[in-house]
Amino acid sequence: MLEPVGERPQLWRAELIVKHIPRKRFGQHFLTDQGIIEGIVQAIAPRAGQAVVEIGPGLAALTQPLVERLGHLTVIELDRDLAQQLRAHPQLTVVESDVLKVDFRQLAERLQHGPVRSAGLPQAETAPKGLEPAGSSSQQGPRDWLRQTAGAAAPSRGSAVHEVTSVGAHKLRVVGNLPYNISTPILFHLLDAVDVIEDQHFMLQKEVIDRMVAAPSTSDYGRLSVMLQWRYAMENVLFVPPQSFDPPPRVDSAVVRMVPHAHPAALDVKLLSQLVQVAFSQRRKLLRHTLGQWLTARGFPGAFDVQRRAEEVPVAEYVALAQQVAAMAV
C-alpha cells in the first residue's frame, strides 16, 4: 500500500505508475501527454465544491489535477489493484465497481450532503455509509460554452439553439477516459440517470464521438446520434492522438462534452429506441421498407414521409413520431 499523499502528489503518482501494469481485459490505455491532460482539465473547468465523479481514474493522470481544483473527488475503478492504491489518496472516495452497476441517482443524492467518505458501492442494494458535510461553494457553473449554445440540435427545434441549464448544486459532473470496448453501454447507462447529471466530459474513440455529434444526411448519423442528441447538447472539444497513451491504442481518440438539455421532450425512451432501431436496421433502404411497415403494423394513422432513408430524418422528427405513436395507446 502506498503512503498517504500529504504534500507529495507527484511522488504518489510516480509510485502508482511503477506499481501497475496495464491489463488488456480492462481495455487499459493510460493517458500520459501532459498537454492533453491540461487541455481536458481546461475543458472541464472544475470548481471547488462541485460533485465530480471520475470513471476509470487509472493511474490518476486526470485525477490529480482535478482533485487539486476540487478539494475532493469520487472515482469509480473496477481494477482491484488500482482501487487499492487510489485509496491511499486522502482526497479521493474510491468506488470499486463495474460502472454499469453503479446507481448514479443514489450517488448524486448522497454527494448532495457532502463527500462520501466510505468506499461502499452506491447501488440500490448496498449504499455507502459515513456521510460527512461538504464545504459550500458560491461559484457558478464554469462553462461559457453552455451559456452560449446547446450545441447539437434540440429535439423540439431540429437546429442549434441557445439554451441555459438551471443546475441544482447536487447534480453530478461526470468525467473519464472510458474503456473503449464498453463505451456505448456506459453512455446509455448514464442516459438513464441524466436528470441528476449537470454535464459529462469523456475521452472516447474518435469515430464514436463522430457518430454521437453527427448531423442528419451524413454517413456518421445513426441510432447513437438520435438517442443521445434528443437528450444532450454535444461538442467534440479535443482531438487526442494514439501517442498520448501508454500503451497507445490503434485508433484516434477525442474528448466530448455532453450537456443535458434543460427542457427535453417528454417521451417514452424505450419506444424511441425501438423506433430508431427499426429505422436504421437497413439504413440504405427507404423507410417504407422498414419503419413504414412497423408503423402500418401498429395502425399508425398519422402522416410521416417514408420515402426517405433513415439518415435523412432529423432528431426532432423521430422524437415527434415517437410521441405520436405513444399517444395512440392513451
From Swiss-Prot:
Provenance organism = Polaromonas sp. (strain JS666 / ATCC BAA-500)
Q: Where is this region: Disordered?
A: 115-158
Q: Which SUPFAM superfamilies match?
A: S-adenosyl-L-methionine-dependent methyltransferases
Q: Kindly indicate whether the keyword S-adenosyl-L-methionine belongs to this entry.
A: yes
Question: Top enzyme class of this protein?
Answer: transferase
**Which keywords appear in this protein's UniProt record, sorted alphabetically?**
Cytoplasm, Methyltransferase, RNA-binding, rRNA processing, S-adenosyl-L-methionine, Transferase
Catalytic activity annotation? adenosine(1518)/adenosine(1519) in 16S rRNA + 4 S-adenosyl-L-methionine = N(6)-dimethyladenosine(1518)/N(6)-dimethyladenosine(1519) in 16S rRNA + 4 S-adenosyl-L-homocysteine + 4 H(+)
EC number(s) reported in the record: 2.1.1.182
Which Pfam families did the record assign?
RrnaAD
Q: Name one GO molecular function term.
A: 16S rRNA (adenine(1518)-N(6)/adenine(1519)-N(6))-dimethyltransferase activity
Binding positions for S-adenosyl-L-methionine per the UniProt entry: 29, 31, 56, 77, 98, 177
Location within or outside the cell: Cytoplasm
**Which Gene Ontology cellular-component terms appear in the entry?**
cytosol
**Record protein name field:** Ribosomal RNA small subunit methyltransferase A
Predominant place of localization: cytoplasm
Q: What does this protein do?
A: Specifically dimethylates two adjacent adenosines (A1518 and A1519) in the loop of a conserved hairpin near the 3'-end of 16S rRNA in the 30S particle. May play a critical role in biogenesis of 30S subunits.
